[in-house]
UniProtKB/Swiss-Prot annotation:
Belongs to the HAM1 NTPase family. This is dITP/XTP pyrophosphatase. One of its GO terms (molecular function) is ITP diphosphatase activity. Homodimer. Its EC number is 3.6.1.66. Its cofactor is Mg(2+). The active site is at D69 (proton acceptor). It comes from the Bacteria. Keywords: Hydrolase, Magnesium, Metal-binding, Nucleotide metabolism, Nucleotide-binding. Pfam families: Ham1p_like. NCBIfam families: PRK14822.1, RdgB/HAM1 family non-canonical purine NTP pyrophosphatase. It catalyses: XTP + H2O = XMP + diphosphate + H(+); dITP + H2O = dIMP + diphosphate + H(+); ITP + H2O = IMP + diphosphate + H(+).
Amino acid sequence: MKKIVLATGNQGKVREMADLLSDFGFDVVAQSEFNVPEAAETGTTFIENAIIKARHAAQITGLPTIADDSGLEVDYLNGAPGIYSARYAGEHASDGDNLNKLLMAMQDVPDDQRSARFHCVLVLMRHADDPTPIVCHGKWEGKILTAPHGSNGFGYDPIFWVPEENCASAELEPVRKKQLSHRGKALQKLFKAIEEQRTC
């Protein structure tokens, strides 16, 4: 099994990514195990922030690194919270704080104007100076509920309605979420890209 560093401090992402990556033969080590401090997310896009995080962790650990930058884009809010999803309610906001702020912002918004999507950008940096990191994007369409449902997942999962399953993301079984989610889709693309490079 190939060791790879996961460049995030978000424990929900660590659990979900470790589970997804183990399916593809990777031994995932969280950056916290190497005492890697969080990188300053100074980018203006998911791609920029993912590259910043991946390069930062690769420089410190000397190992290949995968970084994930993801977020929720709500049409009614002109794409917010977007790249600020993890800190929508403030710099050290909890998942609950962010979720509640979003529910307040969407209060009284009609059902046909609650469309939203999750985005996930994954970057694989083979080493800190990798000139051609692998960049993959996954998207998951849904809408914002008026109240939380379910106890699985993390972040905005309890208020993200999944039309094809007729439930909230937080009500999905983990195996099904892997198949549908923005992160699962981005990982499928990432491993396809890795396989293609191995055969070049």
